[in-house]
C-alpha cells in the first residue's frame, strides 16, 4: 500500500532484500516531519541501490543505512534539528541489533547514517556512506526537493522570501528565516 509507484522488489539486491523490514521501518517514520517521511526513505533507498549497484557497494551496509538514515526526525524538525541525531542513531542501533546483524556491519551502517547529512558538512570516508549522502542530496533536488523545502518551511513558520532581496544578491542566504534562501544555501 505505502509503496505507491515503487516496486518493493526493485529495492532488493543480490546481497540484501529490505522487503521484510519495510512494514516495521514504515512505522518508525510515522512521527517524521513531511520532508523526512517514509516516502523520502523509499526514494533515497531506491536511488542508493541504483548508485550502489553501479559502484559495487556493499548492499548489506548501504540499504539498511538508507532505510534508517533519518530515524529520529520529528514533525516540524526540518533543518532546525539534526534528523539523524544521537536518538536516531540509538534507535537505528537497537533496530539492527534486533535483526541479529553483527557488530561490524552495524557499525558500518551507523557510520553511514551518522555522516550522511548535508548540514554536518562531513565528507564520508566509506563508499557506502558517500553513496547514501549523494542519494539523500539527490532527493533534495527537482520538484520533490522544492515540495520538501516549502513543506518544512511552512511547518516551521518561515517567511517565503526576503522582501528587499529575494535572490540573495546583496546578502548572505539565511534559510532559517526565509524558505527561498534554502536554494542558495544548499541546492544551487
What are these regions (language model features)?
Residues 12, 29-56, 68, 121-188:
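Divalent metal-dependent phosphate-bond-processing catalytic cores, especially two-metal-ion Mg2+/Mn2+ enzymes
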Amino acid at each position: 500500500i505505502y509503496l505507491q509507484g515503487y516496486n518493493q522488489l526493485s529495492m532488493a539486491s543480490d546481497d540484501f532484500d529490505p522487503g521484510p523490514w519495510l512494514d516495521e521501518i514504515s512505522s518508525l517514520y510515522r512521527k517524521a516531519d513531511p520532508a523526512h517521511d517514509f516516502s523520502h526513505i523509499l526514494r533515497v533507498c531506491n536511488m542508493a541501490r541504483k548508485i550502489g549497484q553501479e559502484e559495487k557497494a556493499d548492499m548489506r551496509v548501504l540499504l539498511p543505512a538508507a532505510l534508517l538514515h533519518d530515524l529520529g526526525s520529528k514533525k516540524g524538525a526540518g533543518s532546525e534539528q539534526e534528523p539523524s541525531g544521537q536518538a536516531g542513531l540509538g534507535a537505528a542501533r537497537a533496530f539492527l541489533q534486533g535483526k541479529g546483524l553483527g557488530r561490524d556491519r552495524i557499525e558500518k551502517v551507523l557510520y553511514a547514517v551518522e555522516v550522511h547529512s548535508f548540514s554536518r558538512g562531513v565528507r564520508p570516508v566509506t563508499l557506502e556512506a558517500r553513496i547514501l549522502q549523494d542519494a539523500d542530496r539527490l532527493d533534495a533536488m527537482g520538484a520533490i526537493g522544492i515540495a520538501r523545502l516549502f513543506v518544512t518551511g511552512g511547518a516551521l513558520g518561515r517567511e517565503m522570501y526576503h522582501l528587499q532581496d529575494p535572490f540573495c544578491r546583496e546578502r548572505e542566504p539565511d534559510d532559517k528565516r526565509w524558505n527561498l534562501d534554502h536554494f542558495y544555501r544548499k541546492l544551487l
